[in-house]
Each structure stands twice: as C-alpha cells, then as structure tokens.
Regions:
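Sequence/structural signature of beta-propeller modules
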Residues: 29-66
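Replace the tail clause
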Residues: 85
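Extracytoplasmic/lumenal domain signature
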Residues: 41, 60-82, 94-99, 110-138, ...
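Beta-strand-dominated extracellular/periplasmic modules and repeats
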Residues: 90-92
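Secretory targeting and sorting signals
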Residues: 2-26
Length: 484
C-alpha cells in the first residue's frame, strides 16, 4: 500500500478557463428537507460520496449554477489540524443552544471540529485522549466522518484506532470503540459509512506497508458502539478482531477513498483490498469483494488474473473502491492505471473468480487511480467520472460498455456532482468546475494545494479542505465559498 508521490507545488490559477475536447443514483439517501433561502430547499451532505453507495452525485438543488459559480466569495478558515478528507454538512441543527448550519471535519490527528457554515467560526472541537502522543507523528487518519440520520450525532475516527459517536450539540463523546488491536500499524484511512443503524469502518496500513496488519471491515452498533462483527481480508476464516501478529499473512489494506460502499437496496457491502496474498479461500489480497450487510459472509469476489503480479509490483487493486454503476455492473480501478468493468452476477459466491472482465479501460492519464469515481444517473443514461494525477475524464455507459465522452490533462481528486455541475479539486491548487456531459470548463475557483481532499456542495456553499496528511502538520485550512 505504498503511496506514489504527486507534485504539490502551488500554482496560480485563473478564475476561468477554456473548454476541453471530447459522463446517482439508486443508492441515494438524501437527508431531511426544509424550506430555506439559499435554494429551493435546504439539504444535508451526511457522508463522503453523498449517499451510502458513494455515487458522489447529489440529488439536491444547491443554488449554485454555471451562471453564478464564478461570483462565489471564498473564506479561508484556519484550523488546528489538516483535513486530508472531506467535510460533511448538517443544516439547521442545534449547537450550543442555537440553530446553525454546520460543517464537520476530522483532522489527520483526530480532532473533530464543528464549523459554522455562515461565518466560519469554530462552534466546538473534540480532541481524543492521547492526542499529544501522536500529533506530529506518522500516525494519522484520513477518514471523513458520517452523520446519523437523526442529525443529533456524528461518528468520527482517530489515529488511535477508535471510532467515536459525538453529540452534534456540543461535541462530547457518547461512546468510543476500538476497531483494531494495533493502531500503530493499522490505520483508519477511508471514510466511515452508516446504514440501518450500523456504522461501517475499514482499516488499512501505513505508507511502507510495515507489517503486521490486515485490512478488515468493522460493523458497530450506532446506538451503543458495540463491535458487532469483523470480516478480515486475510485469515478471513477468523471472524473476530484479531491481533495482527496472530495471522500468518499481512497487508491487504482496505484503504480506497470511498471505503465501504453499500448497495442501499440489499445492504450488501462492497470493498476492494490492496497488496497482499490471495489464495481464493481465506486470503483475499488485491480483490473486489461483496459482503453481507452484517459482514458475516462473503457473497461475491473478483481478482484480476494477474493478482500475483499486482502484489509483486505494488499495483494495488484497492487503491480505489468499487463503483456501483447499477444494472449489476461494477467498475474497479487500481494503481496499474486500469479500470475494469465487471458483471457482478458472474462473481457471485465464495468460489474464487479470476479475470472475466467485461471491459478494461485506461484511467484518465493511464496512471494510479487513488480517487473515488462519481456516478450520475440522468434518467436516460448513466455516466461515470474519474480523475487521477494527470487527467479527468467522463464516460457514458452504453450496452454494458464504458464509452469515452471527454478527457483532459488536468489532474484531480474524487469528483462530485451537485446542482448540475461537476467539481474536481486539483491537488496542485484550484477547484475546477465543469459541465459534466461536455467536459466544458466553467470556472476554476482559487485555492491552495492538497492531497486527497475533495469538496462538498450544499445550500449555496462549497466546502473544501486543503493540505496533505503526509506533511504531518497540526494546522490547516478549510475553504468555504458562498453565494454573495
């Protein structure tokens, strides 16, 4: 799970750019709706990727359009930590005895902050016990928190290997549960998810793949924090939270930007694993996996025919999470510069499945895919958008094939779609806004460099953290753009 480098040099970017040559979801779970002023309604953005299926495509109006996006005003909020992840957002919640629209973020060293979406003030911060012992060290998290649908609580991860339930009103911890026995080796890198009263978390390792660690899926009771179940991608015959040293195999991180992806119809959990041994029995490195909603059973699996080569050359399949396209189709990228289109019914069951891809296409620039593609269902068509360090591209799904529609050489992190616009953060600096179906550039909003950060868009506002977790800084910036 070694992370290949990317340039972080800041660059000055114009506020508009030319168009380019040459596209959710049944998984959507929009938050509560209330009448408001910024758009037709006020809406929440409760998790990374908008919905449980991580489509990255908001179904809510935003009030931001191609006609007014260039006029947004930016505020830079100074934070006491770097947020190498995304924000989440709840509108009209009670914090400190008053009603606020609030962004919530978790820093790389585990502080979780509530930020007033109107003025950028810090409403509260939660600092986990032991913070001073790891702040400034290699021990980090890049996990985005998730909100409970009741809108009274959020769930956040820390470098100590704990998931915590925090009260929206004041930030106090309701419960705290460990999902690893060795946080010095096992990292919570991916965003948390929530479905049907359960919090879903995954674990990976740190840069350099220092053993021992095993990627695993942890299921927690959202009410009281009980660790209900663990599915281990190595030693998968052991359905418990294991001491990593007690398993003869190591690695197989679950570290993709989208983490655990949930089919909202069945509740099934999809994950992808990184470098590690694969034997098709109890070791599942470099594989795409479907688990039952409680993570007690494996329901389907796929690994490329060259899985041993992927492991040997550090070309993790699990550098990105599975993409649910609908119609039984799943897309799976990787560090080998390829995106594989899979008919998932051919991958059913516990018997091992190698190869049998419907199609293999290149990532936007043919390099590592570390980001979470976005999926847009228009009613008549399905589009997929992806960005890597060297480009951004859009495909349309036709006759079980991804057909390229546009492409450019501007790199980006995980794309999001909101209010009919496609937003892609360039980690060198700048938030690019596109027309999704044509790829025409609408504007570039000025901001600084980052790493895996990505934006959210709701209620006439955009929130985007800056900064790189691997700099080990204890300060950072949250950019908030607002309609004037």
């Amino acid at each position: 799970m070694k992370i290949r480098g990317r340039s972080l040099a800041a660059c000055a970017i114009a506020s508009a750019f030319l168009g380019f040559a040459t596209p959710s979801s049944r998984y959507a779970e929009p938050g509560p709706v209330r009448v408001g002023q910024a758009s037709d309604s006020l809406h929440d953005w409760m998790r990374f990727g908008w919905d449980v299926g991580r489509s990255g495509a908001s179904t809510a109006p935003t009030g931001i359009t191609a006609a007014n996006v260039a006029s947004l005003h930016r505020q830079q909020v100074q934070l006491d930590g770097t947020v190498d992840a995304s924000a989440i957002y709840l509108h009209a919640v009670r914090v400190g005895g008053a009603t606020h629209d609030v962004f919530f973020v978790t820093t790389t060293y585990g502080k979780t902050l509530a930020i007033d979406a109107d003025d950028g003030s810090i409403l509260w911060r939660y600092t986990p016990p032991g913070y001073d012992s790891w702040a400034g060290t290699y021990r980090i998290t890049t996990a985005t928190p998730v909100a409970d649908p009741d809108r009274h609580y959020i769930y956040a991860a820390g470098p100590d290997g704990y998931v915590r339930k925090l009260d929206v009103a004041d930030g106090h911890a309701v419960w705290s549960t460990a999902i690893t026995r060795l946080p010095q080796r096992e990292k919570i890198a991916s965003p948390l998810n929530w479905f049907r009263g359960r919090v879903i978390a995954t674990t990976g390792g740190y840069i350099g793949d220092r053993p021992p660690y095993q990627g695993h899926v942890a299921i927690l009771d959202a009410a009281d924090g009980t660790l209900l179940h663990v599915w281990n991608s190595l030693c998968s015959d052991r359905q418990e939270l294991i001491d990593p040293a007690s398993c003869s195999a190591s690695d197989s991180a679950i570290w993709g930007r989208a983490g655990a992806v949930v089919d909202s119809t069945t509740g099934d959990i999809f994950v992808a694993t990184g470098n590690g041994p694969w034997n098709g029995r109890d070791n599942w490195g470099d594989a795409t996996l479907e688990l039952s909603p409680d993570a007690t059973r494996m329901l389907g699996n796929y690994t490329p025919a060259n899985t041993d080569e992927l492991d040997r050359t550090d070309a993790d399949l699990g550098s990105t999470s599975p993409v649910l396209l609908g119609g039984g189709l799943v897309a799976q990228g990787g560090k080998d510069g390829k995106i594989r289109l899979l008919r998932w019914t051919q991958m059913d069951g516990t018997a091992p499945h190698k190869g049998r891809e419907l199609q293999v296409v290149s990532t936007p620039s043919g390099t590592d895919l570390f980001t979470a593609p976005a999926v847009l269902h228009t009613g008549t068509s399905t589009w997929m958008f992806a960005a890597d360090n060297g480009g951004t591209a859009g495909w349309i799904l036709q006759e079980d094939r991804l057909r390229p529609r546009w492409h450019n050489s501007d790199g980006g992190t995980s794309p999001v779609i909101a209010g009919g616009l496609l937003y892609v953060y360039d980690p060198r600096g700048g938030l690019r806004v596109y027309d999704p179906e044509s790829g025409r550039g609408v504007v570039v909003l000025l901001c600084g460099p980052g790493h895996w950060n990505s934006p959210i868009v709701a209620d006439g506002r955009i929130a985007l953290p800056e900064g790189n977790a691997n700099r080990h800084a204890t300060s950072g910036v949250l950019d908030i753009w607002r309609l004037k």
